[in-house]
């Protein structure tokens, strides 16, 4: 700052002077707001800690008040690798043995090794899982990966998963069910021309193949010589018995395969080869067919049979001895009016359809030889030869030949499919889980969880019981340990509240500093209400369970709670089922503690009300702060304007004085 004439200042530090004036005005007011805000924030935090410690106790009491809080069961198992269990409150305490015979598993089939460059289609794959099915259209020249994607991406797929395994010899298609259980087996059939690789993706059991063959034979028989209703019934019985025999062979083969797979040494060498299996199936089918005669009704094989005379006839009737040779027996069945007395004449004079057919075939054979010679010499083509041969036949004969050819073609196709089956095979059977409970009850499920195996108990199966080990033991009992821990948590929660309230409302003996809630009546009231509940008697409880002291829970000289574990364990062991009468209900101990705490921490409780009041004070301080800021801003502007005006006036005065000095020659 420079001095002009007569010692007047030529300039002022206006900003510095304004800042000091405003600061002197702001500081005491700002300090009051800040101190009050700090006290409020400290109180809000203290009440929050107090409320949280009380709510912890309240939440524990809410659990105790649940209807089945003391009905929880504890489950132990002797072999967790075989079975585990969970129990609801409905489970009856006791010990049970569980023998796991088999685990549930999903069905899985696999193809033979396929050509890695194979082109499939055109055709269709019909795939079913249990009682649900879908059809996949396979375009011509499709790759194996295209089929896999088609199966897995089909929207109507009920739960079949396809994949490719790259064997050392080539790719294999694996198709498996996503659902376990015997009712969820996979079936696959292919609709394609013979020789199409798509036929390699069919899956048929031996039983199915036998039944298909018998069906084709029956259809062929119908085309050539339709069966009577009675013959159809007998044929159905025969087919059923043959199918049953094939199924038994299927089962024996499957058992052989499983045994071979489980054998430690020589498994491959002991397995049956394909030829032996086919021979076994054929023998079984032949034996079954030989017994089919017994299915013919008595009225069809016993002369003079009636309902009234059936008893006598069945007792006295002897099957007649065969009187004719094989050719005669074969012919006798077709001779109208045949009997033993007239057999010679009838058999000699009657020409059966079979004999007529033989003559026709001989004639056809001669003509066939002539036609073949003409074809070899080039006089006619095979098509012309066939047309010429058929033209010589009557319409009835042509129709008959066409029927025979059609039946023979169908039968050849069925026989070829049976003998040369090259489709998919089963690598894992579909089966339910199965256990034996307590050695008497057999239980099963389509998965490895058996619900309500024992009332209120679910079993989770993990492995089969070792043949050399005893069944797994499952023990179910009341969960006393959990209730004991809950009571310990309640006592710890109260002690935590007590320590927190003492810290917030007391005076630190080392520093002499009072807590943020020192002298607050709410803290004293909270502890007083809880102590009143703790010392009260629960009238609805049994005689020896009416107060906390009978659980061994008492108040120490310092004001905390402590547990006499000998008394607590005695009550848990002797009166476990009666604990709910003390803690539960609308008049029980747990509800009383809840109500006492709710009166403090609830929406209208004393602590909540105080917190609300403090929050409102915070809002008021915010208003005070904004008001102070506005006043200080206004003060700063006014003060700055005054000093600016003073500086202008001073400058003018100095200018005038300087002019006067110059005029006086000074």
UniProtKB/Swiss-Prot annotation:
Superkingdom of origin: Bacteria
GO cellular component: bacterial-type flagellum filament cap; bacterial-type flagellum hook; extracellular region
Keyword tags: Bacterial flagellum, Coiled coil, Secreted
InterPro entries: Flagellin_hook_IN_motif, FliD, FliD_C, FliD_N
Keyword Cell membrane included in the entry's annotation: no
Coiled-coil annotated residue ranges, if any: 354-419
Subcellular location: Secreted; Bacterial flagellum
GO biological process: bacterial-type flagellum-dependent cell motility; cell adhesion
Secreted among keywords: yes
Family stated for the protein in its record: Belongs to the FliD family.
Subunit and partners: Homopentamer.
Physiological role: Required for the morphogenesis and for the elongation of the flagellar filament by facilitating polymerization of the flagellin monomers at the tip of growing filament. Forms a capping structure, which prevents flagellin subunits (transported through the central channel of the flagellum) from leaking out without polymerization at the distal end.
PANTHER family for this protein: FLAGELLAR CAP/ASSEMBLY PROTEIN FLID, FLAGELLAR HOOK-ASSOCIATED PROTEIN 2
Name listed for the protein in its UniProt record: Flagellar hook-associated protein 2
Source species: Vibrio cholerae serotype O1 (strain ATCC 39315 / El Tor Inaba N16961)
